[in-house]
């Protein structure tokens, strides 16, 4: 668990981390450099779930290699499926990280939604549905590894 107190907002407790796969932690079906090391550190602190529509068919393989849980969403209303996952975990203790339009509801439902703008870009709708926006996944994960950075960003 990660606990932080943000001046002007209050105390937050993060127990779950939901990560979108393609475009967020993977590019062209490959995990981005630096991600495995950071997830290794975070696995000691939070429950990590990799959520994917499995566009490239490698979700299970990549999740296994990272030793995280996999949650596959079916074609259709992917936003609603991701939202349901966050609600099941408990939005009040879940951090979500994503870059696509189908991540919007999960970002809004989570206590902390982090928008990653990567080489794949980020949808306009997704960019306006965040608490924090960062240039890449490693910066996003570092915010959880070093939560004092979040305090500086989110304080009121």
Description of each model-found segment:
Residues 1-19, 156:
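Non-catalytic pre-domain segments flanking phosphatase-related domains
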Residues 6, 28-46, 79-80:
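Short, acidic loop-to-helix structural element flanking the phosphoryl-transfer center
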Residues 12, 41, 69:
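Catalytic phosphate/metal-binding cores of nucleic-acid and nucleotide-processing enzymes, i.e., regions
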Residues 16-26, 68:
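Glycine-rich phosphate-binding "P-loop"
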Residues 24-25, 38-63:
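Substrate-recognition element of Asp-dependent hydrolases with the DxDx(T/V) motif
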Residues 28, 50-51, 70-75:
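Catalytic beta/alpha-barrel core
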Residues 59-156:
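C-terminal cap/substrate-recognition subdomain and adjoining C-terminal extension
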